[in-house]
Amino acid sequence: MDDSFKKIIKMTEGPDRTAAIAHWLQRLYPEESIPVLVGGSAVELYTGGAYTTGDLDFVGHISPAARKILTETGFTRHGRNWIHEGTKIFLEFPSGSLGEDERKAVLTVGRLRIQIVSPEDLLVDRLAAWKHWESPVDGVNSFLLYRAQSKSFDEDHLEKRTMTEDVQDALYAVRSLYREYTHDLPADKVLEKWSLKVR
């Protein structure tokens, strides 16, 4: 097993470990084909661990070189998932590329640089799941992500994407709750009850 991966699996679960796993995987690729981190693990990194998940989702393809190293490191393929049984690290590759209007970004966590979906596009994805799939956890994720990244959003891109995905009303609800709780986080029960109010 790769020495750097041995160090990673000894880390405490949380955003630092998630970033280390993402960085380890992305180093297996040449710059032009690095898979982009998306989904709940991207929310985890952008929120500094306010939300945590057990799996890492990437947009991209598994190269033959990456497949070989994953297998040698102890990962087993199950469809589009790669699972490391000893540590329960789950890697998923749900699609080959970001959507046409989606952007990638680079997020630095400690000394690690991670290729990740932009915070605006991640927020829109979570808002859409909350509104269209009636997923309360994505409502909570939307609020946590907005709270953590509100000062760094590209507002023009965010507005364009919310219109395209028909989630302006969901964004309005998140902004309203944010204004109410600018200086502190609402209690878990308050946030859960709020997230059940599907747009």
Feature roles, as predicted:
Residues M1-R199:
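Compositionally biased terminal segments of proteins
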